[in-house]
């Protein structure tokens, strides 16, 4: 049973990396800096309820942020989100 549990954990980790890694690569500038406006929404690790905005590539969309963790594509207002992420 220990081997089966280990293999399941390795498989789960592999799938998570395959899903997450391309999203992080696509958010990277040519000079290696990450463009936070291209990161996916991330509600974080806690269970609190903060209504925030993230830039979805076109507009700023509401989402629930848990209060800890997540990424920097998170803004308190639509105005702040558009100011940082909207391309003129």
Swiss-Prot record:
InterPro entries: Kunitz_BPTI (IPR002223), Kunitz_BPTI_sf (IPR036880), Serpin_venom_toxin (IPR051388). GO terms for biological process: envenomation resulting in negative regulation of voltage-gated potassium channel activity in another organism. One of its GO terms (molecular function) is serine-type endopeptidase inhibitor activity. Coiled coil: none annotated. Disulfide bonds join 37-85, 60-81. It is found in: Secreted. Residues 1-27 form the signal peptide. One of its GO terms (cellular component) is extracellular region. The keyword Repeat does not apply. The keyword Signal applies. Serine protease inhibitor that inhibits trypsin at a molar ratio of 1:1. Belongs to the venom Kunitz-type family. 03 (sub-Kunitz) subfamily. This is Kunitz-type U15-theraphotoxin-Hhn1i. It comes from Cyriopagopus hainanus. The lineage of its organism: Eukaryota, Metazoa, Ecdysozoa, Arthropoda, Chelicerata.
